[in-house]
Amino acid sequence: MLTHFPQAVPEIPVSNVDKAAEYYVNVLGFSFDWGNDDGGIGGISQGDCRMFLTNAPFRAGHGPHGPVIVWLNLNSKQEVDELFERWKAAEAKIVEAVEDKPWNLREFRVADLDGNQLRVFYDFNWEMSEERRYRAGGAS
């Protein structure tokens, strides 16, 4: 029997939950839902995307070590482009500008204050003809 999984909630290692949350809210447009640095964990969200920010004491012995990459799958090239422009205007730390990749993703990358990256993409492989997918290395 297959299980239907809910949305994944990645844990992002940060040096300070409060400072990281401020960046995610003020620059990247997330909402800060709960938590603080004293407790070691905080929750942020934007639409259906939820993430946990955790500091070193919280992660000691059982948490991830950074930096990490979180992939955010958007619904169109236009959404990717619009988000890139919005985050660029907000002075997000752009790691890689938006472009179509040879693996048929339109993507860009930004970093947070601790070097963790959000890799925003749209998979346009399904829009290509079977012949073009084959030539691009994505034969089915």
Predicted feature residues:
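N-terminal beta-strand motif that seeds the catalytic metal site of vicinal oxygen chelate
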Residues: 1-21, 69-72, 123-140
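C-terminal "cap" of GNAT-fold acetyltransferases
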Residues: 2-7, 38-52, 109, 133-140
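Vicinal oxygen chelate
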Residues: 7-16, 43-45, 61-86, 106-111
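Core segments of cupin and vicinal oxygen chelate
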Residues: 12-51
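Conserved active-site tyrosine of GNAT-family acetyltransferases
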Residues: 20-25, 87, 112-115
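Short, ordered coil/turn segments that flank beta-strands lining enzyme active or ligand-binding pockets
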Residues: 49, 90, 113
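Short beta->alpha transition motifs characteristic of CBS
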Residues: 55, 102, 120-127
